[in-house]
Amino acid sequence: MKDEEWDDVIATNLTGTFNLTKALIKNMIKNRYGRIINISSVSGLMGNPGQVNYSSAKAGLSGFTKSLAKEVGSRGITVNSVAPGFIETDMTAYLDDNAKAKLIEDIPLKRLGSVQDISDLVIFLSSEDASYITGQTISVDGGLFMY
């Protein structure tokens, strides 16, 4: 892997999250309320061959989420992370039928997820119903990675 490939992925997935959070957190602290929901990946939880940069960045988001949750929880702010598995998106559209079938073999629910599966969790974590959930990385992966 070239240094540039490493740097670009870390900058997008980890540094970008830091910069966005830094820009928004002061207002949340002032209002004593906020919901921060980071988008990670099961690759950050279980690793993925050929994606050491991506897996490292997404694993870093889990640490970021936990640490920030401890820092700002007393101010009414929850911080969580959603870790999608294999979801029907542009990232999986390139897979041929054989590759897709092989992936599905390893998923206990025997299907790829949908964007709706992810958005439903994000909406829940944004709501008052999730006011006692913080510092968590929640997988939406059909059971692919259980810990």
Report each predicted region and the residues it spans:
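Active-site loop immediately N-terminal to the catalytic Tyr-X3-Lys motif
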Residues: 46-52, 74-75, 110, 128
